[in-house]
Amino acid sequence: MEKRKFEKLGIETSLLGFGCMRFPATPDGKIDEPRAEKLLDRAIAAGVNYIDTAYPYHNGDSEPFVGKVLQKYDRNSFYLATKLPVWAIESVDDAKRIFAEQLERLRTDPVSYTHLRAHETPEHL
């Protein structure tokens, strides 16, 4: 897998990332965990080291699933990104609470990157 080096940050990420918004699903809409785990494992085996998920993906099930699967890997072997749901935040305390929840769901501290998601107006920021 080709990597991109970010000298100032001292990191090297794969040119391809693995997005966790659309995992295979069961007929009832839940994540098909065996199939999804195989996909994530295969991406990591191929050298992908940037994993991207978000608070609302798969009705909130993506972060906990990704956190569970990634437990078997050395935390220093991948970069994990998630997104803070700005539509659910009205105060600094809300942001802190939701971010703490995300760390719990992902079973990690820290995440590598946090993006602000779905900010449609300046008021969301």
Language-model features and meaning:
Residues 1-78:
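N-terminal binding-site loop/beta-alpha segment at the start of enzyme catalytic domains
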Residues 21, 54-56, 83-87, 116:
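Active-site beta-loop-alpha junctions enriched in small/polar residues
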Residues 31-42, 91-105:
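Short, acidic/polar
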Residues 46, 106-109:
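A structural motif corresponding to the C-terminal end of an alpha-helix
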Residues 50, 110-113:
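Residues at the N-termini of beta-strands
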Residues 65-69, 83, 94-101:
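Generic beta-strand or strand-like secondary-structure segments
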Residues 114-123:
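Conserved small/polar residues in nucleotide/adenosyl-binding loops
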